[in-house]
């Protein structure tokens, strides 16, 4: 209901109060006509009785309303226009305006302080407003009580920097309890090795978590009927172990799979804030190179981890994470190399088995390697660690012993899927 002074003139109000005082109309009917409560009614009645001649309900503004400058107005509309173009681009995974981002951008870039309701008001007036779709419930929730109880790991393939005209992969790892982002990197190609490097970075820095939570991507899980068209299906789901999964098995870390897109949605929602700002900043910065985009990502990652209060936990992720570690509310364990292995290169690596021929050689596709201390007929387990872009270190294990170490050009390892 609108304000009293907008619905009644002072004279109309005087008449109603005067009739009440003369017992011509009961209070409850007067209140209903005016649309006010008992307390407000008696406040007005007292004011009328104290000064009937000068009684008024007309609102008098004591100071001019706050307004924004034309330049600020122009910048708001400029930023809203950029967002509109982003939303209209079907290649970009953004479907709504982010008024909070625009508020932050006005403050940081233009040094203009504007309230969020003001930005939303201008958006509605100038056609930069979309109704939010109703959220659908997902069929699984992951609830954790400890840091390291569950690490949400994901990869998203999108046009993060539209000016580059190239889609990149964003690989991320996030602690479910604290919402602290442990790892984030942009890559042009997604490989098993890229995900293994993510494991190595997180585990060596923070320790071994209790479990990882991922989708059923072929890098994380072999699924019958999907991952090999020529396969005769003698193997069922999970009877073939992907490289990434073998690393976690060596580390004694459990894996939990999201069995539906709805369940996986819980993984993706915490990343939404980071992804949203990454795209909007790359658009405004005309970012074309992946190295430049990574710098933008690092900046937004720091802001997310150390400055932003998370909407779910109502805490800054870094502070919540550190408090959990300090108070021993953590399931992270110290990483140690599993015997008989000697180096992290034996754990965070690609693996394959070969049989040593009578000439103490093995073959990797068309590449033949002669091994030292090899026994013909024995099986050798190759642990391949890409040391650089050009060279990989192959560590050869047989019967629990490291029998040889060789360095090979990656171009010679054709057929090995990094």
Question: Model segments located where?
Answer:
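Short, basic alpha-helical/linker "hinge" immediately adjacent to a nucleic-acid-recognition surface
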Residues: 2-7, 27-82
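Residues that mark the N-terminal boundary/hinge immediately upstream of a DNA-recognition element
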Residues: 25-26, 98
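DNA-binding alpha-helical recognition surfaces that contact promoter or target DNA
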Residues: 43, 104, 117, 121
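Short, basic alpha-helical nucleic acid-contact segments in DNA-binding proteins
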Residues: 48-52, 112-113, 121-134
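A short, amphipathic alpha-helix used for macromolecular contacts
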Residues: 63-115, 156-161
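RNase H-like DDE/DDD metal-dependent nuclease/strand-transfer catalytic core used by mobile genetic elements
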Residues: 149-170, 176-292, 405-412, 418
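C-terminal, beta-rich DNA-binding module of retroviral/retroelements integrases
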Residues: 305-418
């Amino acid at each position: 209901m609108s304000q009293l002074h907008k619905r009644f003139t002072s004279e109309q109000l005087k008449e109603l109060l005067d009739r009440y005082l003369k017992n011509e109309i009961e209070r409850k009917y007067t209140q209903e006509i005016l649309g006010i409560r008992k307390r407000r009614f008696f406040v007005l009645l007292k004011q009328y009785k104290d000064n009937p001649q000068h009684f008024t309900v007309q609102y008098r503004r004591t100071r001019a309303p706050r307004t924004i400058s034309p330049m600020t107005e122009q910048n708001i509309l400029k930023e809203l226009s950029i967002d509109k173009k982003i939303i209209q681009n079907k290649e970009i995974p953004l479907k709504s305006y982010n008024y909070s981002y625009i508020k932050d951008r006005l403050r940081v870039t233009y040094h203009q302080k504007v309230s969020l309701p003001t930005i939303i008001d201008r958006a509605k007036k100038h056609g930069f407003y979309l109704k939010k779709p109703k959220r659908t419930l997902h069929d699984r929730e992951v609830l954790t009580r400890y840091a390291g109880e569950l690490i949400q790991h994901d990869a998203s393939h999108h046009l993060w920097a539209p000016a580059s005209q190239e889609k990149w992969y964003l690989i991320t790892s996030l602690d479910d309890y604290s919402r602290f982002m442990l790892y984030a990197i942009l890559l042009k190609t997604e490989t098993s090795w890229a995900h293994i490097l993510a494991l190595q970075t997180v585990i060596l820095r923070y320790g071994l978590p209790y479990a990882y939570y991922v989708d059923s991507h072929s890098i994380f899980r072999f699924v019958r009927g999907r991952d090999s068209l020529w396969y005769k299906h003698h193997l069922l789901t999970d009877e073939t172990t992907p490289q990434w999964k073998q690393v976690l098995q060596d580390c004694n870390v459990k894996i939990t799979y999201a069995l539906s897109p709805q369940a996986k949605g819980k993984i993706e929602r915490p990343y939404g804030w980071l992804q949203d700002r990454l795209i909007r900043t790359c658009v405004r910065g005309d970012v074309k190179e992946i190295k430049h985009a990574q710098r933008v990502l690092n900046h937004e990652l720091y802001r997310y981890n150390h400055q932003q209060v998370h909407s779910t936990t109502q805490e800054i992720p870094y502070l919540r994470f550190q408090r959990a570690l300090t108070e021993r509310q953590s399931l992270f364990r110290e990483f140690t190399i599993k015997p008989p292995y000697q180096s992290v290169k034996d754990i965070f690596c690609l693996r394959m088995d070969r049989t040593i021929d009578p000439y103490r050689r093995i073959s990797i596709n068309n590449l033949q390697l002669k091994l030292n201390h090899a026994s013909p007929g024995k099986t050798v387990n190759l642990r391949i660690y890409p040391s650089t872009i050009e060279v990989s270190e192959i560590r050869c294990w047989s019967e629990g012993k490291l029998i040889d170490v060789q360095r090979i050009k990656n171009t010679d390892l054709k057929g090995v899927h990094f």
